[in-house]
Amino acid sequence: MILLRVHMKFAEIWTTRQSSTSFRVTTTVTDTVSVTITEGESVLEIANTLEKNGALGDRDEFLSLCNSEKFDSDFDFIKAETNADKRYYKLEGYLYPDTYEFYRNENAESVIYKFLNNYETKINEKQTVDGYSKKTTVLKMVEESDTKYSLDQVMTIASIIQAEAADKEDMYYISSILHNRLTADSSLGVSSLGLDSTKFYPYRSLEDVPENDRSTYKSRYDTYDRKGLPYGPICNPGMDAIIAALNPNSSDYYFFCHDSKGQAYYASTLEQQNANLEYIESYDN
């Protein structure tokens, strides 16, 4: 008699059966799928990715759980969130981008636990970071940061960096600009963060907003209207963006823009920003 391993696929079972005169299954045989969640995907986009790959049993349940208090008691970083009633998805920012193994049509709650457990592991994991004399963790960097932003605020900044930056180097300059704008006085002509990436959240763009709502849609996270940070993260950032949020470059920049190839242009004044935009428009058509 042969006992089969849990989660053996059909081909393995058939091979095992052929080499034995008898066998019995001791656990439910379940096929699995490998799914990669890329940095910057939002809760809505992750739901689509999981569903497309056959890893999610109930998309609507997944989205509902992502805005519930179900996980507060198990994860302090979720329980510590503020503005919960104003967020579109409480778990936005904490579904860590990575490659995961899921059962086909896996229970939504089980899927979310895998994301949150991984995030908890990552923020407690020691790693080498430029500027630190010894290995450190995300939580330690938050604790020691001069800005005194909470972990949730850091994740919100990181999510914006992830959404706006063209590459890793750009992340540290955009981090600097965000930190500068958050502490700027009115004499600099900076009244808000004014970021396109927040304008239509939880959607990526106006085209992603349901057609019936497009003409009147207004996001609560729109940083053109709202001062300071949005109510929470706008996507799920990777570790590079999180570290950049905690370690901004030192600069006097308050503005940035990119051309169609991702080349970044930074500016200290609105006049310089407008000149950069005019320059890009002159050749980037």
Locations of the language-model features?
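Signal peptide-directed extracytoplasmic domains
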Residues: 1-122
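Bacterial extracytoplasmic/cell-wall-associated proteins, especially those involved in peptidoglycan
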Residues: 55-56, 71-285
